[in-house]
Amino acid sequence: MDEGNGGVNVKKFLDTLDKTKIKYIGKGILVGTLAGIVVSVFRLWIEKIGEILPVIYQYLKVQPIFLILWTILMLLCAIVVGALIKSEPNIKGSGIPQVEGQLKDEISVLWWSVLWKKFIGGILSVGTGLFLGREGPSIQLGASCAQGVATKMKAGKSEEKILLSSGAAAGLAAAFNAPVAGLLFVVEEVHHNFSPLVWLTSFAAALMSNFVSLTIFGLQPVLHLGDIPSLPLRHYWLLILLGIVLGILGRFYQVILLALEKWYGFLPLPAHLRGIIPFLLVIFVGLFFPNYLGGGNQIIIALGQHSPTLIALFGLLSLRFIFSMVSYGSGLPGGIFLPILTLGAIIGSLFANCAVIFFGLEPTFVKDFIVIAMAGYFAAIGKAPLTAIILVTEMVGSLVHLMPLGLTALVAYVVVDILGGDPIYEALLERLVKGKKTHLTGQRTTVEIPVLAGSKLDGTLVRDFDWPNHMLLALLRRGDREILPHGDTVIKMGDTLEILTDTTHAGDIVRTINEQM
C-alpha cells in the first residue's frame, strides 16, 4: 500500500515539473561542457605562449641576428591569419558583434568553419602578444559550439537562439572564471530582457563551463589582487569625478575605435592582410616592453602591487591605447574586453596617484581605484554597467566594492549617454551589416522584444499599435504565463513580445518597433 502511494507521489511530483525548463537546463549543461573544454584549451594555449614571449624577446635582444627569423615567423603568422579571415570573414575582430547578429537574424554563420578558424586565428593573434583579448573569441567559440549542438539536434530557430545565447555565456565564463557575468552579459548586452528559458539555459551553461575552467586553471580569481581595503565614505566624491573622467575617455575610445576601419582603408593592403602591420609592430613593443605584451592581465596585477610614477603611467596608458587600436583595427581575431579593463586599471591608478598628491587620498586606497576604474571604463564603453560590475567583482574575487563600483559605473554610463555614445558592440554590428542586400529567405524565425518602463506599448491594445509589415505577433509572455494575443489584448510593462517573421526582416522589424516604443 505504502509502495503504491510512493509511486503515485513520485508520478505527481514528476508531473508538476516544468519539463521544458528541465530539458533546456540539460542542453545548457551539454553546451557548457563543450564550450568549457574548447575555450579552456584556447585560453591555455594563449597563456602558455604568453609565458615564453618575454624570454624570447630577452634572447632576441642578446642575439639580434635571430630577429630576422622572428620577423619572418611573424609575417607567416599574419599571412596564415589573413588567409583564414579571407576564407571566413566572420572570424574578424572579437566575434561578439557576429554573435549578436546571429541572434538578430542579421548574420548567417557556418559554425564549424568559424569554430576551428577562430580557434587557430585567435591563438596566433592573441598569443603572439598583440594587444587583444581572449574573451571575444571565447564568446564566439562558445556560441559556435552551441550552434553545433543545435545543428546536430536539428533544433528549430527559436531553440537554436537559446542555445547560442547559452554558448556565449559559457564562453565568457570560461575565459574569465565569471559565470554570473557570463549570464548578465547575455541578458544585458545581447538580449536586453530577462527571458526565463534564456537565463536558465545560459546560467546552466555558464556554471558548467566555469566548472571545467576551474578544474584546469584552479580556484584563484583571474585578477587576484590580494586584500583590498574598503573605501571610506569621505572619499566617495572622488568616485563621481572618476566616473566623469571615465565617461569622457570611454566616449573617446568609442569614437577612435569606430574610425579605425576608415583609417586602415587608406593603406595599400587587402583587408585580410592588414594584420601584417600589428604583427610587425609588436616586435618593437616586445623588444622594449616584453612584460606589457598581450591582453594586459599581468599589468593589472602589477599595478595592484606597486604604483609607477605619473609619467610612467601616462606613457603606459598611451602605449596600451594606441597599440590596442592598431591591433583591433586590423581586423585580426581578438577581443577588446581585457584591453579595456587594462586601460581602465591604468586610468584608475593614474587618477588615484593624482588624488594622493592633490586631494590627500591615502596611498593604501590606490588599489581600490584600480578595481573601480576597470568596471567604470567598461560600463562606459560597452554601456552594460551590471555586466561590468559583476565581471570585475568575479575577476578580482572581492565583494566589498559593489557600492563604489555601482556609483562609478552609473556616472560613467550617464556621461557617455550625454555625449551620444552607443553600446560599442551594437555600433560594431551596425557597421558589419550596413549595406547588406535584403531578400526573403523563406526561413521562419522568432524575435523577442521586451516592453520596458515608459514604453508607449504599456497599456496599449494590440490593435491600436502600428505594427510593421512582414510580421505576426505570435505570443505575449507575462512572467511565466504565455498569452495568445488578439486585438483586445492589453500589452503591459514587463511583457515580452514574441514576433514571427522571415529571418531577413527580423533586424529591421526590431528596430522599427523599438523606435516607435
Predicted segments — roles?
Residues A453-I509, I513:
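Cytosolic Rossmann-like ligand/nucleotide-binding regulatory domains
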